[in-house]
């Protein structure tokens, strides 16, 4: 599970953006929305991010994607902000792995395409419950500091290791047991993060699960059926014959396996099996594609990051998906989602205040902040407040003020 994220000079973020996914220990409301790691560490199971278009919601997702790609040695897309004059992108993530909390950060020069700074720590607490960093390694080419307290031999090679990639991919890990452990931890958290864009979500994962015909297949199918989409069944038919102009077409002729898979996904209505790609709505097909990601996250305790979760989905379905994470049955799965549907801005029945975040932008740049920052004493915001109403009134910022009607007035004046 992710405990915090921090980005600076990445894409639209021209300054430091921080997001904590740790629960407020003073809040006893909706304890089912929280995973208890230890006596003094509770992690939020879900986080909802709101804000106008073009204010940084997708940028946040892209930053997480860059971290995942970096840790898995994949080709990444990470650009510095064009207005800062700096080429250095900074990314940091804190997370839980094997019931311990770690932090990892790096600085990437997107002009030289080099990693000029890396640091990894274990986060521990002292006798007074204050968080302390226990250094695992530091590779700082800026100030020329190279440390690895647990392995002096590794520390000696940090200054000659290549900067073209992060440490775990530039030094032979077989020679350094501590480095092998570091790689296991970092790739472990990266593989535990799934990222989905609802505007272009592939259904390949759902297709593969349907092909497997195992327990997860049953859960995916039940999940889709229980969404009240009027579906009686949802399946993949391997030996389905494809006909064009009344003639059965050989699969070898069509060749495109992805196309064939799409055709072989069928929905059943009133006992009649029909091709999903033809008969199902866009929202139904998106939900079916998302089903496998949700089930996998719940079953395997993954962190599921979704951009535009409510795209083409009824608000009750979106609410039900969030509720799957916000419940006592879910132990370790985590949801981070961007949203526009304000009907889900609900602290009476759905979210704790620290689970709701906003992005906003002004002449100084982009900002990211939590509803928790708005108190009753200063802002009149309680857990029982009507958050939707206050958001519409602009009391939290992060709301657009479109003036589209002026366009019509200008056109009308020109015609006159």
Label for each model-derived stretch:
Residues 8, 200-279, 396, 400-401, ...:
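Extended helical coiled-coil dimerization/tether regions that scaffold
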Residues 41-81, 287-288, 293, 324:
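Phosphate-binding glycine-rich loops of NTP-binding sites
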Residues 46-50, 250-295, 303, 309-313:
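Conserved ABC ATPase signature
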Residues 314-319:
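Short alpha-helix of the ABC ATPase nucleotide-binding domain corresponding to the H-loop/switch region
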